[in-house]
Amino acid sequence: MRILGTLIMSFYVHKSTYFGHDSIKYLLTRSCDIQHSIEGPAFSEFRRGSMPGRESVLASYAMLVAGYMTTVFGPEIGELVSVDPATGAELGRVAETPPEAVAAAVERGRAAFIGWRKTGFSERQRAVMSAREVILAEIDEIAGLISAESGKPVAEAIAMEIAPVLDLMQWIGRNAERMLKPRRIGIGLFSLMGRSSKVIYHPLGVIGIIPAWNYPFSIPLGEAVMAIMAGNTVVLKPSEMTPLVGLKIGEVFEKAGFPQDVVQVVSGAGETGAALVRAAPDKMIFTGSTATGKKIMAAAAESLTPVVLELGGKDPMIVFDDANVELAASAAVWGAFCNSGQNCAAVERLYVQEGIADNLTKRIIEKTLELKQGPGTHEEVSIAAMSSERQIRIVERHVDDFREAGATIETGGRRVPRGVGLSDLYFEPTVITGATNDMRPMREETFGPLLPICTFQTEEEAVALANDSEYGLTASVWTSDYAKARRVARQIEAGTVCINEVLYTHGIGQTPWGGFKNSGLGRTHGYEGLMELVKPQHIHTNRFAILPDAWWMPYSPTAVDLFRKMSRTFASGSLLKTVALLPMLVKRTRELLKK
């Protein structure tokens, strides 16, 4: 076998494996002599997916490290089983990456960084645009894979995962150089002394990325592209629930011709992620629960690895009585039920002013009942399967809690009975009225298709209700009074507040993404997100490097008198007062020259 890399991945393929994915077929038909590494049935039979029964075949090919492959980790290391939430069918199996191999990947990323950081922005842009072309050429295959592995409707796979990333790639490719251009700093009166300052931006090095399972393509790919354009290399640990999408991301970069080890994908569950943090990359970007984010931050602190954390949300939507009711109802339905509610920015608390509460609730229920539910691969489906049994049980518990606390389940509130060929991970979109902030489900993140509705009377009450949460990721304000909207928005404790919009701004790559309070630290996307991926260096220059500075040693009564007057002068910023100090500066300089 022709060795092209130094790390490997084993893949166990069964008759249930989804051979329709080019991401699998491509890896199985690499030009290297992989046939000699196959045990069991003939390789041609393996490639056709025509193996009889459930006999597993070990395909010896690499952990995807920018597409380069070698020999195999044995089956004893553990494997991830990829399952289609819609049907419960197994899609494939991916070997977990051993901890020592994760550390080695970070070291290879550091070696690749030496060369990658020297590339010009135009070269990086060409590489990113090539990756963009790969995605465009395979958009339907990628959407199908995302839908199959995450359970979401194919419409959302395209609209909320692929399209936003394509836009981000174009924006960051065209604008990274401008945003990272060296910047001069005004230094006030010091400039009169022949001094100047500027800031230049250096890439950090290796960026470790651990994304969530709910947006397995757009979250990690967007973060990786921004890191790459800033001159960094990337080690990505996809969610253990969506390992095939993670491999597809690696394949995109490989097909685009990225240099080896600039982007590496390490597959695995929690221990693999922990190993990535222990390997001390130059920054960690994590998307997931607040509890796990705190653990990652604590582990990263051992090596002083900085972190960006995008964590939980319990996002409020405030609808005033002068809002467009029809528009607000449609927005609430989409904002609450998109991706079966599995969004950190989903509408999980709807506060509506009493005057329109009945009308708005009625329209929300009517619109909810119109939604079609089923496998995400069906293009007419709006509500697909949830991701896992664990997640759907949280939703069931919250429905029970609402009911026991006295709220009313207006529609939905239960699992959909198992259909032929389908899993039991479908939960009806649920509208709840009579909710109050003291109910437990109003304080915990649900991450499911529940829309609890509360009422309020005054603007001040609405703000207080919205801020009564440990989370602060996003919020939205709905009103025809834009002065009121802006006034309320400024008071809401959230990283993003939309006015007459909801949820979608993660898909605008130019805008920063991140939260307040327990919703996380730092930002991804936008200028602010780009600044998380570089380290600023301040360069200060003295163009009149002839005479000593007046504040140098040795000190004297003359020096102290001068310093006292300089403090008052510089604090005022007055040019005239500074000029008046010139005689004392000359005297002090002569004093130093005599030493």
Label every PLM stretch briefly.
Residues V13-K15, D22:
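Short hydrophobic alpha-helical segments enriched in small aliphatic residues
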Residues H36, F46, M51-R195, S387, ...:
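N-terminal Rossmann-like NAD(P)+-binding subdomain of aldehyde/semialdehyde dehydrogenases
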Residues F46, P52-G53, D84-R93, I318, ...:
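Conserved C-terminal structural/oligomerization subdomain of aldehyde/semialdehyde dehydrogenase
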Residues G88, R124, I146, M169, ...:
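Residue-level signal for inorganic ion chemistry
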Residues F113, R117, R132-I135, I139, ...:
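Structural signal for hydrophobic packing residues in well-ordered secondary-structure cores
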Residues G186-L327, F456, L582:
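Rossmann-like NAD(P) dinucleotide-binding subdomain of oxidoreductase/dehydrogenase enzymes
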Residues A291-T436, I499, M584, R588:
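ALDH superfamily catalytic-core signature
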